[in-house]
């Protein structure tokens, strides 16, 4: 877990208010469809029932467990399921009309036809991106007790297969005084279509200029693939010398198995992943122009290019993608009730799961978007 996210959450809310752009994974398990206990007092005054389903990013699986418990406690006549199948699968399921919302670590891509497909799925109405789940991405590795610093340039070369040994001269130069083993580096990447992969590739391109591929499918020419966030974390924990990119919460869960998190040099010296360093990076958060204040797409390229001292800009924004209109009456009520519950539970339990609770004007803007869903 990353501790003390309160300052970070406050910064996130402030940045959303001042941004010039205000006018922005495969685990095959469901988070569950059984009803949680409790919430009887709230349920006495609220009549929401029926089945609500979502699918997509595995990065927010733990967050969805928090939200599901709160939602079913408040609305005992509702049923909820979230399948953490990866961002790509979630978008396809949403656009195909088989689920009510999609979780995606990447915004819908117009050049891939996803925006138009979503509009068609929503009965001719726009789909909106609700960035409700925010968390940093860790560079997790397995190298015994060795603490490692890596520059963004070195990181790109590792994942391209240009650096293959832990005692490579480039890594030595960034870790003076550290006894680096002559050990093969095993790159672990997401084999499914993943928004985490999409964002990590955007990050490598923005931060280094030494990365050519893009999209949810990570290149498979180097290393070994694994499905979902938990899959790559498990793989790194089981292979001495392995390295991967994964949401911080999953990396922390594997610390007892020998997994460590690298300090990254974004241009002003090695930075440890912490609530403070994430908060510094969020000072530069901005949103893209989308034509609607309720469609909130983060300008990730600008964020990833940040090299301010003490900042950790490798941050994942997980969107929950919904129809702005076009649901039937029951589904609209369920969607609005669920996401109001999500926004009412940006709390300590969410922090403990490794995420950044949103607050302030950003939270207010999300609430306005949910209220505007028809």
Predicted regions and their residues:
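C-terminal motif of bacterial Sec signal peptides marking the signal peptidase cleavage site
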Residues: 20-24
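Extracytoplasmic ligand-binding site segments that recognize negatively charged/polar headgroups
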Residues: 136-140, 145-234
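Small-molecule pocket liners
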Residues: 134-139, 145-146, 184-185, 269-270, ...
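Bacterial N-terminal signal peptides that target proteins for export
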Residues: 1-12
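N-terminal segment of the mature folded domain
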Residues: 27, 32-172, 233-235, 242-254
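Extracellular/periplasmic catalytic domains that process cell-envelope and extracellular macromolecules
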Residues: 94-96, 121-124, 130-133, 149-150, ...
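Second-shell loop/turn segments in exported
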Residues: 50-56, 79-82, 126-127, 140-146, ...
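Flexible, solvent-exposed loop/hinge segments that line or gate ligand/substrate-binding clefts
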Residues: 213-348, 353-374
């Amino acid at each position: 877990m990353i501790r003390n996210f309160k300052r970070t959450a406050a910064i996130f809310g402030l940045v959303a208010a001042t941004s010039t752009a205000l006018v922005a994974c495969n685990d095959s398990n469901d988070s569950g469809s059984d009803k949680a206990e409790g919430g009887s007092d709230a349920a006495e005054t609220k009549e929401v029932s029926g089945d609500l389903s979502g699918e997509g990013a595995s990065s927010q699986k733990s967050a969805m467990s928090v939200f599901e418990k709160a939602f079913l406690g408040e609305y005992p006549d509702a049923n909820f399921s979230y399948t953490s199948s990866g961002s790509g699968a979630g978008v396809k399921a949403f656009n195909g009309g088989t689920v009510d919302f999609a979780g995606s670590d990447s915004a819908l891509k117009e050049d891939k036809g996803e925006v138009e497909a979503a509009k068609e799925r929503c009965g001719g109405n726009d789909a909106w991106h609700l960035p409700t789940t925010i968390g940093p991405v860790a560079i997790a590795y397995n190298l015994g007790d060795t603490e490692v610093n890596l520059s963004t340039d070195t990181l790109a070369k590792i994942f391209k297969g240009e650096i293959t040994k832990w005692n490579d001269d480039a890594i030595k130069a960034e870790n003076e005084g550290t006894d680096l083993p002559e050990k093969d580096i095993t790159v672990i990447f997401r084999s499914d279509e993943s928004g985490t992969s999409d964002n990590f590739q955007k990050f490598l391109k923005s931060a280094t200029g030494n990365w050519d591929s893009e999209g949810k499918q990570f290149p498979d020419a180097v290393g070994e693939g694994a499905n979902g966030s938990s899959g790559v974390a498990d793989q790194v924990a089981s292979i001495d010398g392995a390295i991967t990119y994964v949401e911080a919460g999953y990396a922390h869960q594997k610390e007892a198995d020998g997994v460590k998190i690298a300090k990254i040099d974004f241009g002003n010296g090695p930075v440890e992943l912490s609530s403070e360093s994430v908060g510094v990076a969020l000072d530069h958060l901005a949103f893209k122009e989308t034509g609607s204040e309720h469609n909130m797409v983060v300008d990730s390229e600008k964020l990833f290019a940040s090299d301010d001292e003490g900042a950790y800009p490798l941050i994942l924004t997980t969107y929950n993608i919904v129809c702005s209109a076009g649901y039937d009456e029951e589904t609209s009520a369920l969607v609005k009730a669920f996401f109001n519950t999500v926004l009412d539970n940006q709390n300590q339990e969410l922090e403990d799961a490794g995420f950044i609770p949103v607050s302030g004007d950003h939270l207010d803007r999300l609430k306005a978007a949910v209220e505007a869903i028809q």
